[in-house]
Regions:
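Short Fe-S-cluster ligation motifs
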Residues: 154-195
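N-terminal pre-ligand scaffold of iron-sulfur
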Residues: 38-127, 131-137, 178-200
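N-terminal secretory signal peptides and thylakoid transit peptides that target proteins
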Residues: 4-27
């Protein structure tokens, strides 16, 4: 008995069922990927939340965790963004999340400021309440900070109250606590960050 040699059948194109399975698989994964990206976008835009860590907003250490050692007594202030601690998502998709951090003498802080401070470190919105400029002109002798655009001056020892200039209200404060040697958000902004529309 002689065997006839087997001939290889050429590959055939995928059948309808295989194409349908592939299409359904792709269709099911796309919304999940979009949902995950949308969640990250929402977390990046969200205002600071309790237990957020604080990271450098720029410079050589951008995105790195800020520790107590990074904040010497008397300043200078650091600009930070909050970072969601479980997924390490930096909330940097809104300028209104920029935070000023500075360590002051706790004995010079008023009661409200001291209650929101951690180890003398105070945190405020870094966005002026007048027209939304970045506030950064530090005055170490007085413990104040000025907006370079229209010269509003805020007293960081007294809940960032307005001392001079056209800003209509104080900089919103951000309560802090210390966790594992790092300043950490203890609650949401006290006041709305940003400026009032129509401010001149």
């Amino acid at each position: 008995m002689t065997e006839t040699p087997r001939r290889r059948v050429p590959d055939s194109p995928p059948g309808r069922r295989a194409v349908l399975k592939l299409t359904v698989g792709v269709a099911l994964t796309l919304p999940v990927a979009h949902f995950v990206n949308a969640q990250d976008d929402n977390r990046r835009k969200a205002r600071p939340q309790t237990n957020d860590r604080l990271v450098f907003a720029g410079g050589d250490r951008k995105g790195q965790l800020i520790t107590l050692a990074d904040l010497p007594a008397g300043g200078p202030p650091l600009t930070a963004y909050p970072m969601e601690p479980t997924a390490n998502v930096v909330r940097d998709d809104s300028r209104l999340n920029q935070i000023l951090l500075v360590r002051l003498d706790p004995n010079r802080l008023n009661g409200d400021t001291r209650a929101r401070a951690a180890d003398g470190i105070v945190a405020y919105s870094a966005v002026c309440t007048h027209t939304g400029c970045d506030v950064w002109d530090w005055q170490p002798a007085s413990g104040t900070i000025k907006c370079p655009c229209h010269f509003s001056e805020f007293d960081l020892k007294e809940s960032a109250r307005v001392l001079n200039g056209p800003a209509p209200r104080r900089l919103p404060a951000l309560p802090l606590k210390v966790v594992d040697g790092a300043p950490t958000v203890a609650g949401g902004f006290v006041g709305r960050p940003g400026f009032e529309t129509g401010g001149g």
